[in-house]
UniProtKB/Swiss-Prot annotation:
NCBIfam families in the record: TrpR
Family per similarity comment: Belongs to the TrpR family.
GO BP terms: negative regulation of DNA-templated transcription
Assembly and binders: Homodimer.
GO CC, alphabetical: cytoplasm
DNA-binding interval(s): 68-91
Disulfide-bonded cysteines: none
PANTHER family: TRP OPERON REPRESSOR (PTHR38025:SF1)
Pfam families, per database record: Trp_repressor (PF01371)
The keyword Signal belongs to this UniProt entry's keyword annotation: no
The protein's name: Trp operon repressor
InterPro entries, A to Z: Trp_repress (IPR000831), Trp_repress_bac (IPR013335), Trp_repressor/repl_initiator (IPR010921), TrpR-like_sf (IPR038116)
Role according to the record: This protein is an aporepressor. When complexed with L-tryptophan it binds the operator region of the trp operon (5'-ACTAGT-'3') and prevents the initiation of transcription. The complex also regulates trp repressor biosynthesis by binding to its regulatory region.
Length: 108
């Protein structure tokens, strides 16, 4: 059995706070129409490409017309990435899933 030290708990909390700080910064950037320059500053080209691929993975998983193996071939993503997307989608709140369906599938 793995013991969790207070140190690892403190680091996890710090990382969560840093994430929430970034989310708030991004929210403010959207409000001031500075979101694109902020994201270009914060993310490398590879990270931006990976996010785009993840959106496509979620979109195709919601559509349900391709197997995970077909998605791997179509998108050039690793099967582990697609499986993580599938598992995340399964555990996503119903409201988020409905919103994603509306945004990603009905606008396509």
């Amino acid at each position: 059995m793995t013991q969790h030290s207070p140190y690892s708990s403190a680091i996890a909390e710090q990382r969560n706070q840093e994430w929430l700080r970034f989310v708030e910064l991004l929210r403010q950037a959207y409000a001031e129409d500075l979101h694109l320059p902020l994201l270009q500053l914060m993310l490398t080209p590879d990270e931006r490409e990976a996010l785009g691929t993840r959106v496509r993975i979620i979109e195709e998983l919601l559509r349900g017309e391709m197997s995970q193996r077909e998605l791997k071939t179509e998108l050039g993503a690793g099967i582990a990435t697609i499986t993580r997307g599938s598992n995340s989608l399964k555990s996503a709140p119903v409201e988020l899933r409905h919103w994603l369906e509306n945004v990603l599938l009905k606008s396509a």
